Amino acid sequence: MTKLIQWLTVLLVLQLGLVVGLNLTQTGLSAPTSQMRLISIGNIEIDQLTITNAQGEQVNLLKKEGSWIIPIDGDFPADHEKVENFLQRLLELQRGLPIGTTPAALHRFMVEENNFERRIALQSNEKLIAEIFLGTSSRARMANARSSQDTSVFEIKLATYEVPVKSEEWQDERVVQIPYFDIDAIDVPGVISLVRSRSADTGTSTNSDATPATELWSSVELGPGESIQQDGADTLAKSISVLRVTDVLGKDMKTIYELTPPQLTLVVKTINDATVVYELGAIEGEDDYVLKASTRPEYFLVPSHLATSLVRATDRDVIVLKQE
């Protein structure tokens, strides 16, 4: 009996040793999260992104005083949220299993220093921190990728079309917008002047699709039997609040801009006592429109559907109701 107990004790010790050994082995095989990422930059703050395509086209995004700008567009504001989300996505890219490790594989997958679909350079204080080469993948929404510090190729969840090199793709398209609840008054010269009633609008809701309160908009320019169509007036305010641009046309007035006089002029007063003047006109030979806002030195391209919608919203018959 004593020998049996001794053998069982030895067997138990061996089993415990085996369990501990397996746990240690598995722990050793589980790489830290940072080692599973395509790139790792630690706590370094990236303040510059440069994206280049196979044809040599390039866009540079620079973080200045906490905001992203586009130097090639005269330091025009970039879409801060879009840039930050893109940067975070780059830092979270996982390596997975390599799909190639030889020089021939790097060439075939187009992730070489001079052979790529996209090159993304991340810098801090003008120092290169990380560099990623992207090549095409046969799978949708995927790309072959390699860090400049690695000789292996990995397939990642980021398509090359999600990494544009056109500056307009990174511009803040909302730069001329005025938040809906910040609009205090709207003047359409020669048509109507509207004033917002703050007593009818508590301003507690941020939903610009909400039904306007009774008598939210008023005007002193109404004739006998006329009243404000609240839905129509509110549609105009909402059209201003969602106004977006698709490109920066520069700071110089051109003869093809039909702004002398403009097709539409809007004067908007805000809750902060600021005045913003919008001038909208057609562009000779094009479907889209040109917009000039007094808050910016640039001229902007506005999509045709947004421009025509804004023009229709300023029609007096849409805003003013006449009693028969």
Where are these regions (language model features)?
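Secondary-structure "cap/kink" motif recognition
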Residues: 1-324
